[in-house]
């Protein structure tokens, strides 16, 4: 009799659980349909975008076809777009709905002003809210929950010209101090937030700040390395043979030129790589002009459908585990045995703190 009672109670709990889940699912579906309808009434979406050129048409076309909502895009560098949002908010103008930038740029240049909204309350679709679908088994937010990391890739620190550089001739950062590389290195400017600052800051975590500064000084003074802030030029000039090596390149630009057949290759070094989102971070300003359209876009973009499109457009692997890295260069995909440093918020904070150190080294050479 007790056994029968136990079975009855268990079945009752199970049925209640199923009813609860079914009801929760129905509520979520109703909320989604209501939000989509409201978004269609708004009719448009404004995105501030720092990404490779091919991302813009891919996003606008797919979202318009899927929901009938037009996307208007403002492009620029991370610092430019951040300054624009801060300036607009300071003037009481709320024009941006979504911003795509690097995580450190979003957090440091916009989030610290309180101009980013928490993302989790916007997430409606179960497949997006499910932490198990994402790298690390959890939703990839910063601590404030306002910057969502949707790209996760191994960041190759070197691009080289295959006509003038033999494969495996550069295996360590220290190899670039050899005489044969004098006047042949083009690095991304480490004195601003970006790939260069990310790269030298990683070395500072490995070696300590003093040794990293000495290394940067050696490259700039003894090796007479050139500096650029133009990501396309950085890789293009190596492909054209003006320089043999691009140090700390933009991954999207590197992938584009490799796939186009330029005489370049990317390589990892023995010191390991940073597992980075690059500019693959999404934020929603605190007062979006079209809040429902922003919510629909965020859910769609972070879904399997949206991330499949993102992989094709960015040519970098998604942080979603159920999205394949088809078409992505193997050097950008984190291998199971690969030595990587997972870029995190603490690293981003140190990176920002160290910018004046790198700037001082760069300026000492330019005097």
Where are these regions (language model features)?
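A ligand-binding cleft/hinge motif common to bilobed small-molecule-binding domains
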Residues: 105-109, 244-264
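Extracellular/periplasmic bilobal clamshell ligand-binding domains
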Residues: 324-367
